Amino acid sequence: MAQFQIECVESNTEESRNHYSKFILEPLERGQGTTVGNALRRVLLSNLEGTAVTAVRIAGVSHEFATVPGVREDVLEIIMRMKEVILKSYSSQAQIGRLLVNGPTTITASHFDLPSEVEVIDPTQYVATIAEGGKLEMEFRIERGKGYRTVERGREEATSLDFLQIDSIFMPVRKVNYSVEEVRADGSIPKDRLLLEVWTNGSISPQEALSSAAGILVDLFNPLKDISLEPTDTNSDIPDDPTAQIPIEELQLSVRAYNCLKRAQVNSVADLLDYTQEDLLEIKNFGQKSAEEVVEALQRRLGITLPQERSSKHS
């Protein structure tokens, strides 16, 4: 069997928080384009490790609905800004970042006092605005992880009651699209060409993301090369897909869209990843408006984008 080739045909890394690359993998046996594309897409979106702010402690603040004197944003807005900050940690241990700023000034990520193991991807990323006489003193916990972690799970691991927990999105890959084309060479048997587009948040390049995803898949399937009939310990812990842990209730959909998905046995974000935007319209009583609502909720809350259409399929 001939080995396929991979080529990066387009790349854009000018924006700090939005890196893009387009890859072509060919030639693949017929049917393998969809198999490889779907597997890579799922792993890229769900299984790569990233960095996120998981908790914030602000001086003089005991809950997220408070305000800080002299700061234009309320605490909830500050927390949302911190959730969006793109960082990269080189440590497997949780790290603590700090901020101490007096007004008047506009606070950006460049004001953070970070450990040497942590890098800020975009120093210009906006956090808050402080007026004359105002002051913002803050500590925040930085962790590495995969997928999405809700506040409830994070609270169990909290090290201090003073910290306000944050729903954390660790996924460094924002979006993945793929399509499959049929190619022929000199009248030979038709083959598949896989076109794969990858967008990341800048903490990892699309090339690094693709390499890591391929490594995960290789490690996953490698034991199948030498199948043993000897009984094995079936009680070993198998890590869950982080995306599978997110119920569709977290998307806060309308009652109509929610009920339609439930009737179609779509109970989690992992189930949704098996659908394209075109597939959603085939769900009974699921109209264009509901499909747009689901797509928008996935993008806004988790940074996930469903493909517009099905990949090309050839009989």
UniProtKB/Swiss-Prot annotation:
InterPro entries: DNA-dir_RNA_pol_insert (IPR011262), DNA-dir_RNA_pol_RpoA/D/Rpb3 (IPR011263), DNA-dir_RpoA (IPR011773), RBP11-like (IPR036603), RNAP_asu_C (IPR011260), RNApol_insert_sf (IPR036643). It catalyses: RNA(n) + a ribonucleoside 5'-triphosphate = RNA(n+1) + diphosphate. Keywords: DNA-directed RNA polymerase, Nucleotidyltransferase, Transcription, Transferase. CDD domains: RNAP_alpha_NTD (cd06928). Residues 1-228 are annotated as: Alpha N-terminal domain (alpha-NTD). One of its GO terms (cellular component) is DNA-directed RNA polymerase complex. It is an enzyme of class 2 (transferase). GO terms for molecular function: DNA binding; DNA-directed RNA polymerase activity; protein dimerization activity. In cyanobacteria the RNAP catalytic core is composed of 2 alpha, 1 beta, 1 beta', 1 gamma and 1 omega subunit. When a sigma factor is associated with the core the holoenzyme is formed, which can initiate transcription. Belongs to the RNA polymerase alpha chain family. This is DNA-directed RNA polymerase subunit alpha. The lineage of its organism: Bacteria, Bacillati, Cyanobacteriota, Cyanophyceae, Nostocales. The gene is rpoA.
